[in-house]
Amino acid sequence: MGGGSYKASDWTKLKTSRKIDSSSVDQIFKSRKMDDKFNPKFIQVREARDSEEHPNSTPIAIGVDVTGSMGYLSSEIIKNSLNELMKKLYSTKLVEDPQLMFAAIGDTTDEAPLQVTQFESDIRIAEQLMELWIEGAGGDSPEDYQLLWYFLAKHTDIDCFNKRGKKGFCFTIGDAAFHDSVTGGNIKAIFNDDAKLYRTSELAKMASEKYELFHIDLNAGKMSASKYIPGRVISVSPSEVKYLPEIIIAAIQLISGKTNDDILNGLDFSAKQVVSRAVSTLNVGGSIKL
């Protein structure tokens, strides 16, 4: 997957046809159950492949907590953040041939613990995102963000790593803590894989072999994932959700060895303040400060 290119005009047409700006979360995300095409139980592999059109594919997986209080975040992403992230990725050419996958993350006790789209480079990213079921179950108890790590480690095949030894990127986003493990029964039920218990720390290690892992904590650092991915947790307040595109891009830039000026260039004062603080503690071979 991953053909085509993202165009702002395509997003404008989609927003108009779906009346996204004036619609509620329930009106935007109309699915009331998980579609089999996004159910990891029926997905052997998701691929991010090079092509003549995109010879240097870079997979970026973004997993969003869709339980309980996180409904507002799903709305923000579809209305604003997705378009801004894609526009900036393409206009700045920060990442070669980006291919985005979105994941809806819940808890192993939910009806839909994990849903995953294809890796795409065009408006199909948004179209698939809007087909996900925003289940809204659960509350602020620990969630199972590590299910996405398992899927990326076991069920993705990415040319950037296979051909060039470069890692993809994964950002999980939410306001709850991680569970410490996934039982073998849940692995079997969710992925239809051999039943085996995995510690969350083990899954972080597995996924980090092919992906640069980050967790964006929307609970002001109170639910830190640092014990699983030390130096890769970004603390953001709910009021700063609108800056997610800039924060994600800044983290990718840090991995790419960009300078402080590269990262903050072009941002307005408020964005500079938020981005600088949010990623200043990341351990990626350097950090940025105003």
Range-by-range predicted roles:
Residues 1-290:
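Acidic, low-complexity intrinsically disordered regions
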